């Protein structure tokens, strides 16, 4: 669901940067004594997403340049902290993820996020479309552009960070981008765009699980 708007608003690099910044969230959580890495990743991801959003609004440089600098710097800081403490080997599995490690309370959290996403999408999808087409025109229609952008960025950060433990840092961007990009090539309108993206995401997920189960 979120991937369609990520692609539509040309934020593919944004989600990729969030995924790579997870290492810093883990490192800071470990340094501060937070036992659950998911919690530290979500907190750091929200801060990182908001920081990127604020800097983008100031137009200090091109969006791709800003995201690249922050993603690289954040990843480097995370690797440095984890390597210095000798803990990197404990978290290296997060690079590729492990869906078998999912626990019941984490499934519950994912379901809660899914419901929140659906509610937000029903309320905000037309507003986000208007913002992506012409922000100034959206403001003239009394759409709170900054608020919509902030909520969307926070929602992406939460989804990305919660999914990393099972999808992996290296593949988290593909989870959002590939189904939406595939759907965009065959869709004739926004309704089909969202429906096909969901179908592609579900099909690829089930196919991937099936192939890995029968070949391993």
Predicted regions, residues:
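Generic alpha-helical transmembrane segments of integral inner-membrane proteins
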Residues: 1-2, 43-51, 77, 111-120, ...
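Short juxtamembrane and helix-loop transition motifs at transmembrane-helix boundaries
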Residues: 1-9, 27-36, 127-139, 152-163, ...
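Short loop segments and helix-boundary regions at transmembrane helix junctions
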Residues: 4-87, 183-196, 211-216
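Re-entrant/interfacial helical elements at transmembrane boundaries that shape
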Residues: 7, 22, 93-95, 132-136, ...
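Hydrophobic alpha-helical segments embedded in the membrane of multi-pass proteins
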Residues: 19-21, 46-47, 147-158, 170-190, ...
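Transmembrane helix-bundle core of multi-pass membrane transporters
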Residues: 63, 67-126
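C-terminal binding/interaction regions
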Residues: 92, 96-101, 200-216
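Helix-loop-helix "hairpin" substructures at the membrane interface of multi-pass membrane proteins
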Residues: 107-176
